[in-house]
UniProtKB/Swiss-Prot annotation:
<comment type="function">
    <text>Component of the oleanane-type triterpene saponins (e.g. ginsenosides or panaxosides) biosynthetic pathway.</text>
</comment>
<keyword id="KW-0560">Oxidoreductase</keyword>
<comment type="similarity">
    <text>Belongs to the cytochrome P450 family.</text>
</comment>
<keyword id="KW-0812">Transmembrane</keyword>
<keyword id="KW-0503">Monooxygenase</keyword>
<dbReference type="InterPro" id="IPR017972">
    <property type="entry name" value="Cyt_P450_CS"/>
</dbReference>
<feature type="binding site" description="axial binding residue">
    <location>
        <position position="428"/>
    </location>
    <ligand>
        <name>heme</name>
    </ligand>
</feature>
<dbReference type="GO" id="GO:0019742">
    <property type="term" value="P:pentacyclic triterpenoid metabolic process"/>
</dbReference>
<dbReference type="GO" id="GO:0016709">
    <property type="term" value="F:oxidoreductase activity, acting on paired donors, with incorporation or reduction of molecular oxygen, NAD(P)H as one donor, and incorporation of one atom of oxygen"/>
</dbReference>
<keyword id="KW-1133">Transmembrane helix</keyword>
<dbReference type="InterPro" id="IPR002401">
    <property type="entry name" value="Cyt_P450_E_grp-I"/>
</dbReference>
<dbReference type="InterPro" id="IPR001128">
    <property type="entry name" value="Cyt_P450"/>
</dbReference>
<protein>
    <recommendedName>
        <fullName>Beta-amyrin 28-monooxygenase</fullName>
        <ecNumber>1.14.14.126</ecNumber>
    </recommendedName>
</protein>
<keyword id="KW-0414">Isoprene biosynthesis</keyword>
<keyword id="KW-0479">Metal-binding</keyword>
<dbReference type="GO" id="GO:0016020">
    <property type="term" value="C:membrane"/>
</dbReference>
<dbReference type="GO" id="GO:0016114">
    <property type="term" value="P:terpenoid biosynthetic process"/>
</dbReference>
Amino acid sequence: MELFYVPLLSLFVLFISLSFHFLFYKSKPSSSGGFPLPPGKTGWPIIGESYEFLSTGWKGYPEKFIFDRMTKYSSNVFKTSIFGEPAAVFCGAACNKFLFSNENKLVQAWWPDSVNKVFPSSTQTSSKEEAIKMRKMLPNFFKPEALQRYIGLMDQIAANHFESGWENKNEVVVFPLAKSYTFWIACKVFVSVEEPAQVAELLEPFSAIASGIISVPIDLPGTPFNSAIKSSKIVRRKLVGIIKQRKIDLGEGKASATQDILSHMLLTSDESGKFMGEGDIADKILGLLIGGHDTASSACTFVVKFLAELPQIYEGVYQEQMEIVKSKKAGELLKWEDIQKMKYSWNVACEVLRLAPPLQGAFREALSDFTYNGFSIPKGWKLYWSANSTHINSEVFPEPLKFDPSRFDGAGPPPFSFVPFGGGPRMCPGKEYARLEILVFMHHLVKRFKWEKVIPDEKIVVNPMPIPANGLPVRLFPHKA
């Protein structure tokens, strides 16, 4: 079946390319105001350079697309065509600052059409508009002072997770376990679902959604895009069932108005006094669950990878975490004060996020014609900023491939150079939430085990986040009591 689709897709792409060839070249945007367009090529008609953009990630080198063109054109801004759209790629801290500082002035958020199709809004608004609504709703929930009450809960979930998934096992595959851990926390914190069977039922379709969100938007059976659309419908139906039950529980006094984001959404009206419908809430919870577990699960997986490869770094994390263990009474849960003591551990996690950023970059759209660095950017062009353009740039981070947590001592890296959570008004509101679940994971991991990689040279693929090709199998060595 898969072999059948290869020639079929090739013919489909060829037909589309030829059909639109004339239209594409007649409608190419031109420079204005006397400034040239950025240097670069737009690749094949319609397809553009989408394949090169995606395939370098599939091969484990997402930065290659960026750095090859930066070198070729001797420029921090270059043009391309991705997902059928003319685009400019902005590279470096100065470019990041420009884009982040001009959010909703010169640029606005943009997602490929595949995102809107995987996450269709029940209110007929775009994913961009839905995200704006969510960002207005979430800040209070994700403030550090609000998240403090969830630290003990995360600690309990982590303890249960390691007892059931790691202990008494010689080998484990890390990435699926990390996904289970972060998804379990997201389900509990966002919708108060914690029954393992119910969590597992929701988790299964999420892998397909994550793989298909940023993919070639061909909706044919067997494609990642088709699988993502089907899986999102399955999850949405399950979430509507959870929402209906919560409404009943709230009415009967069995649920609290402040217990989680779901209750907050059900009981909060907009400026006109209108409450969100069940489908609308399901859409938003679906997006939260994706964002609330995917990036952290990738980060936790790479923490395990790097600590296996760097015994001296492991030892530093172990010593710090054991000091916290020794300060606790038997059965006492982690508190905010304990998290604040995990300074070296968080430096290590930040270095992991620098070298393997779950968010490789993000798109913006030009709201009007503007110029930057002597180049004209036409209205409607898509703009892409890249984390790797600063994270592994030797001008920003000396010896960029060296793992060095001390980069984050003191004031840390230069502004706009370390961007695993984005920046500006669109910085991920769940940054502090992710910090907590990563540190709690590290605490439980190192106090229980040392480990080694089963596949020393395991390949890394990026689709759309970095993931070890085999899920990172490791051999566990429990600490002696």
